[in-house]
Amino acid sequence: MKAQVLLPKVFNFPFTYNSKIKGKIGNLVEVPFGSKKEIGVIWKNNYEEPKNIKIKEISKKTEYSIDKKLIDFIEWFSSYNMVPIGLVLKMVIGNTDKFINIKDDSIILKKTEKKNFDLNEEQFAALKFLEKTKNKFDVSVLQGTTGSGKTLVYFERIKKIIKKNNQALVLLPEIFLTNDFKSRFEDFFGFEPAIWHSKISPKQKRLIWKGIINNKIKILVGARSALLLPFKKLGIIIVDEEHDASYKQDEGVIYNARDMAISRANFERIPVNLVTSVPSIETYNNIKNKKYRHIKIFKRFDDYP
């Protein structure tokens, strides 16, 4: 049997390998490439190559895999943003070949003192509004002034999502990944958040990546690149400060993380909540055209900024 393996490199096509393993589409496998070993993903199976061509063999199958929904999203992301599909895969699996065989302990998220918070009437109404769509794809905008408790509303929604063994992704502009947000998260959930951004160490990235693909990490708070991580059971995406211009990446792989988050939620068939004090022009137009649902909260919530 032959298999097409996509590599996380600047290629717009997969490579054909002989396969004696029982590999499925989405399996991460080790393959020879030039003089090195590389980690790639089985993209297609039972692919017949013309005879009389020397084809190398898949070395081994790893314990990791990505699902068809993510594969479809990668293909769409590549086409929509005009980026080689191998580069998109690199954003998903990173430098996996450098750490996939390292036996790390699971990431340990420090437990903290948990505080009790009660939603006020307006926040409770907003939560119920957001929950109307249950577990299907939906884009809802939660708008509120600073200090109105928008964060508490989506924390409550996340709490219900992860109780069903699902995962949640909270996207924030990197500048907002502050100690203040971390403290609020810890006060509500009783443990420190797993955080993904450009400045975390390679070891921390390795542990988080494995925790995400194994469904050991239930909530990830991250900058824009986090939206391409291989979540095992993603249940909701929150885009906080959706109006912030830093969601647009202008160098390297060019994309708008807010828009791509909405698209990923569509492929996953899960809800996405856009959180803002003042909606962006694009979001405002989608609200006006009834493509996005919209709710406002006004009252200041003094106990929880």
Residue ranges: model-predicted function:
Residues 1-278, 282-284, 288-304:
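Accessory, non-ATPase domains that flank or precede helicase/AAA+ motor cores in DNA-metabolism machines
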